[in-house]
Amino acid sequence: CERVKYLRNYYTYLYGLPMKLNDPGTIIEPKVEKRTINGEEYWVLKATYEESVGRDTWYFFFDKQTFALKRYQFFHDESKNDGEYILLNDEILVEGIKMPKNRSWYFNSNDKFLATDRLSVE
């Protein structure tokens, strides 16, 4: 089923961040900007993609002190403020790799909460 393949690839991408930013077809904006959101300071990296890879615009927010990836945001059409932002909270160790334990999703347009993905290892 195409939807299952899409979701598998999408979540593989999310769990592979930020290393997936090195994938072919990823275009990283050369200038990193500083941004403060709710009192938290971030280094923000903008990524777009070659047409064969994807059409969305993504922003990746790294903690200014630790450089840990703390949130990301994507737009299908940035001028419409569509898409979502995702907050990463807590960490879990999976086979020696630190992974975000909780991923909370919100709409860009109105900050409405969508859902939280929770990673658990048993």
Predicted regions and their residues:
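Flexible, processing/modification-adjacent segments and terminal tails
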Residues: 1-56, 76-82
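Gly/Pro-enriched, hydrophobic low-complexity segments
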Residues: 41-122
